[in-house]
A protein has these predicted regions:
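A conserved amphipathic terminal alpha-helix motif
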Residues: 117-170
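Glycine-centered tight beta-turn/hairpin loop motif at sheet-sheet or coil-to-beta transitions
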Residues: 10, 57-59
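Hydrophobic ligand-binding cavity/cleft-lining segments
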Residues: 1-45
Length: 170
């Protein structure tokens, strides 16, 4: 690993949550992106080498592949394709990784989410920071603990609509 890679990893977006569920159940809930990120996801989100498609209107479209899965411990997804309607450099998310490190802590579990490669220098960083913070600290946490997250709904406004209004992306 060279110095540039180390710096990029250390500056990558990251959030840590603690949930009151066992690590294996936590792992299973994370893999169901429809339960906490978006009901409009197409494809499998829980099988290694499978690619799923996420979109929110024409504002954000991406294809993501699960590249590593260690039950109860770790999930790594790689962004294969990405398009944002509100930035110039469409390569910002391409080849970045969504990493979920899962650690048992007594009766609870710690989940550290890192979007490796999503760094403050990126044009999308502030919007993406807001989005991931909401999805990880609210929707994913609630989904793991109660079975009810707050994914972006198919047929009505949700968290993404709030973000689009806040950042003037409509």
């Amino acid at each position: 690993m060279n110095h540039e890679t180390e710096v990029k990893e250390s500056k990558s977006f990251s959030k840590t949550i603690t949930v009151n569920k066992p690590h294996l159940e936590t792992y299973d809930r994370i893999r169901n992106f429809r339960g906490w990120w978006s009901e409009e996801i197409e494809g499998n989100t829980d099988r290694v080498d499978e690619v799923f498609f996420y979109h929110y209107k024409d504002i954000h479209l991406c294809k993501i592949r699960l590249i590593e899965a260690i039950p109860g411990k770790k999930l790594i997804y790689q962004v294969v394709e990405n398009e944002f309607s509100f930035i110039k450099d469409q390569s910002e998310w391409v080849n970045t990784k969504l990493i979920f490190d899962i650690s048992p802590m007594g009766n609870a579990t710690e989940v550290r989410f890192t979007h490796e490669g999503l760094v403050p220098e990126y044009e999308c960083y502030q919007v993406c920071n807001d989005a991931w913070t909401g999805y990880i600290t609210n929707s994913l946490k609630n989904y793991i603990e109660t079975g009810h997250g707050n994914p972006n709904p198919k047929d009505k406004d949700g968290f993404n609509a709030e973000l689009a209004r806040k950042w003037g992306l409509n």
